[in-house]
């Protein structure tokens, strides 16, 4: 898959793939933390869009995949900036924002920042405010001390043999971008929240929190029986595509 480079106003180079398509509405995909546009869900969405001639855009956050910067120097603040520029400089139609894990958090931030350019939002195993949850509930006192002392720690991950780097910078940036602290979320767009009931990484109750706080009257919480955090088996991918198709049909009118 050939990619292009977007030079952002923050002097970062963001790798992206854009299929122009023939549709009046496009899909913009936001990957998870430590993931990139070569992920299973991203590729599946892109191929499905191409088959149907729907506009589709994939990209890598800075510090991820083929984009510039080091992961350790990047945070959700930069990733939201990157996402915003991709939406406004690469895509040419109103978009359905579709975000996986941390990408669900970012998709909602982007929807809040761009209400006119957003047509709908789909989240898959959304991880809103996960940095706050990590700090509060998951890191030990020793891990917190190490982060404060060294600026980062590495924690083991079942998704990456080298583990995840958790930085002080990203914990702090997360606190500036929280969405669940507000009483209501000004999301008025159609919203589809897909989550597995067996998600060990992020409870489906996180999607329920978004569901309860959003202003949208057209919101659906879709719980996948026995679904894990990845939601990447064939049946689950099919469900994501079906949800994308029905939302597309609904908002294109």
Model-derived segments and spans:
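The serine-hydrolase catalytic nucleophile loop
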Residues: 33-46, 205
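Short beta-strand immediately N-terminal to the catalytic nucleophile in serine-hydrolase-like folds
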Residues: 97-99, 124
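The alpha/beta-hydrolase serine catalytic core
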Residues: 117-223, 228-253
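Catalytic nucleophile-loop/oxyanion-hole region of alpha/beta-hydrolase
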Residues: 65-90
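Short beta-strand element of the alpha/beta-hydrolase
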Residues: 24-32
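Conserved alpha/beta-hydrolase
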Residues: 42, 46-68
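N-terminal cap/lid segment of alpha/beta-hydrolase-fold proteins
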Residues: 1-21
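Gly/Ala-rich beta-loop-alpha elbow adjacent to hydrolase catalytic centers
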Residues: 99-107
């Amino acid at each position: 898959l050939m990619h292009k480079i977007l030079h952002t106003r923050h002097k970062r180079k963001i790798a992206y793939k854009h299929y122009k398509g023939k549709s009046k509405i496009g899909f913009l995909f936001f990957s998870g933390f430590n993931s990139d546009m070569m992920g299973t869900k991203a590729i599946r969405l892109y191929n499905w869009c191409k088959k149907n001639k729907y506009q589709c855009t994939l990209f890598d956050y800075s510090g991820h995949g083929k984009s510039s910067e080091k992961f350790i120097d990047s945070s959700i603040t930069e990733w939201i900036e990157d996402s915003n520029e991709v939406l406004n400089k690469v895509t040419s139609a109103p978009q359905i924002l579709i975000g996986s894990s941390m990408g669900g958090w970012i998709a909602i931030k982007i929807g809040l920042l761009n209400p006119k350019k957003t047509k709908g939002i789909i989240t898959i195993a959304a991880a809103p405010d996960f940095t706050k949850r990590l700090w509060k509930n998951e890191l030990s006192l020793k891990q917190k001390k190490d982060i404060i002392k060294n600026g980062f720690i590495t924690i083991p991950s079942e998704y990456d043999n080298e583990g995840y780097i958790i930085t002080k910078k990203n914990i702090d940036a997360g606190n500036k971008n929280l969405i669940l602290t507000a009483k209501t979320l000004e999301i008025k767009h159609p919203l589809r929240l897909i989550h597995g009931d067996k998600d060990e990484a992020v409870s489906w109750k996180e999607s329920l929190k978004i569901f309860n706080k959003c202003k949208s009257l057209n919101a659906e919480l879709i719980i996948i029986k026995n679904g894990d955090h990845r939601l990447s088996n064939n049946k689950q991918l099919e469900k994501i595509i079906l949800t994308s198709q029905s939302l597309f049909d609904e908002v294109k009118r």
